[in-house]
Amino acid sequence: MQPYLDLMRHVHEHGTDKADRTGTGTRSVFGHQMRFDLQQGFPLVTTKKVHIKSIVYELLWFLQGATNVRWLRENGVTIWDEWADAEGELGPIYGYQWRSWPTPSGEHIDQIAELIAQIKRNPDSRRLIVSAWNVADIPRMKLPPCHAFFQFYVADGKLSCQLYQRSADIFLGVPFNIASYALLTHMIAQQTGLDVGDFVWTGGDCHLYNNHFEQVETQLARTPLPLPKLHIKRKPDSIFDYRYEDFEIVGYESHPAIKAPVAV
């Protein structure tokens, strides 16, 4: 995960100090790209312990098309609690847009199902895209999509994915986002009979919150460990039938966790 640490160091040392929506203050750069060869290991940060359970359950929750945190809480995942209302609702966020993008005629588009069908039918398409950035629905979202748009690419029997993340909380959010989309790429590759290729992460506003600087310096002083491997124990009938128990991260060794406050 050296590319991730390089981004963190670059922003910490050369970023521009700016105000932000949360009132916390950030140091940021605009525009950065990282590439991870998924054949070489699963891109999970090792310079601090990452909560794998939250990553897996959140992705399964997105794939359900869910927008209420109840199911996450039932499974011990609280990463969305700060944004949910009293009933646990978040509005038409990621899962809704992925699975039920509304059309002017009142119908809904299942972007994930259509994506997989397109990969199988026309793998050379340049339209293998899923978007969560629905401008009409943003006012009703508790938090507009940070990881907003992703595209797949098939070459030499391998499936690659590129994510565009408009807003990137480097210390807390980005390790989750990298692992989540790497996991999704593995799942879709399995469903479409392909091997995995690269995961490409592209960031817009890449920032460190001012109250994370001490934690950043601690993390940058640590030496990365070898990447783990992902093992998917079975192939379900569809992308929507995976369970938490289907995934095993093999050989994950990390430095201790580093706690930091979330900017809401």
UniProtKB/Swiss-Prot annotation:
Listed transmembrane segments: none
Domain of life: Bacteria
Pathway field: Pyrimidine metabolism; dTTP biosynthesis
Disulfide bonds: none
Function: Catalyzes the reductive methylation of 2'-deoxyuridine-5'-monophosphate (dUMP) to 2'-deoxythymidine-5'-monophosphate (dTMP) while utilizing 5,10-methylenetetrahydrofolate (mTHF) as the methyl donor and reductant in the reaction, yielding dihydrofolate (DHF) as a by-product. This enzymatic reaction provides an intracellular de novo source of dTMP, an essential precursor for DNA biosynthesis.
Pfam families from the UniProt entry: Thymidylat_synt (PF00303)
Entry keyword Transferase: yes
Family to which the UniProt record says this protein belongs: Belongs to the thymidylate synthase family. Bacterial-type ThyA subfamily.
Species name: Ralstonia nicotianae (strain ATCC BAA-1114 / GMI1000) (Ralstonia solanacearum)
Binding site for (6R)-5,10-methylene-5,6,7,8-tetrahydrofolate: H51, D169, A263
InterPro entries cross-referenced by the UniProt entry: Thymidate_synth/dCMP_Mease, Thymidate_synth/dCMP_Mease_dom, Thymidate_synth/dCMP_Mease_sf, Thymidylate_synthase, Thymidylate_synthase_AS
Localization per record: Cytoplasm
Self-association and partners: Homodimer.
GO biological process assignments: dTMP biosynthetic process; dTTP biosynthetic process; methylation
Active site: C146 (nucleophile)
Reaction equations catalysed: dUMP + (6R)-5,10-methylene-5,6,7,8-tetrahydrofolate = 7,8-dihydrofolate + dTMP
Protein name: Thymidylate synthase
Cellular component aspect of the GO annotation: cytosol
Record CDD domains: TS_Pyrimidine_HMase (cd00351)
Principal localisation: cytoplasm
Alphabetic keyword roster: Cytoplasm, Methyltransferase, Nucleotide biosynthesis, Transferase
Positions bound to dUMP: R21, R126, R127, R166, S167, A168, D169, N177, H207, L208, Y209
HAMAP family per UniProt: Thymidy_synth_bact (MF_00008)
PROSITE patterns associated with the record: THYMIDYLATE_SYNTHASE
Entry EC number(s): 2.1.1.45
Any GO MF annotation of the entry: thymidylate synthase activity
